[in-house]
């Protein structure tokens, strides 16, 4: 059974909304984990702060570059690239033996998240019928607004559970 064009749009939209929410979540999860991460890697607060700063910096640089990618790759390829970078970045973070590798993983995550943000808006504005664009953007806004608010809670729970 194959999905209709409308069904594929909804599935794609849901995947990208979830990816954007996870991108926002990982940005704020680190805030409550920073002290533990600094202690684990033996770095001071000014060095440890790079984990949050580099994420925002890489995200900010990536967003404008997505137009270039979108003109050269299919939407599907761009979404897979974003999800792949985000996933690989997360794996690198979990397995990071050194602080530098952890920072590199955060950059990969941020680039993946940075790709999803404009793609989400593009899907909402071009793949949905004219009357549903606002609803699609509203759904995206709810997810994007909710995720950063629970990030510190999740980060705190992770630190309490695993140190």
Task: Give each language-model segment a name.
Residues 1-163:
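Transmembrane-helix bundle of Major Facilitator Superfamily
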């Amino acid at each position: 059974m194959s999905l209709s064009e409308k069904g594929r749009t909804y599935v794609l939209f849901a995947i990208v909304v979830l990816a954007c929410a996870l991108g926002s979540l990982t940005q704020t999860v680190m805030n409550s984990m920073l002290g533990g991460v600094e202690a684990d890697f033996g770095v001071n607060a000014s060095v440890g702060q790079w984990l949050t700063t580099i994420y925002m910096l890489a995200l900010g640089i990536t967003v404008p570059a997505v137009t270039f990618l979108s003109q050269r790759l299919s939407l599907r390829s761009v979404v897979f690239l974003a999800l792949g970078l985000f996933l690989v970045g997360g794996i690198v973070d979990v397995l990071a033996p050194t602080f530098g590798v952890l920072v590199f993983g955060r950059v990969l995550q941020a680039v993946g998240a940075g790709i999803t943000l404009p793609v989400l808006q593009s899907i909402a504005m071009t793949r949905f019928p004219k009357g549903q664009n606002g609803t699609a953007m509203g759904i995206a806004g709810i997810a994007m607004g909710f995720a950063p608010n629970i990030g510190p809670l999740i980060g705190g729970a992770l630190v309490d559970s695993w140190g």
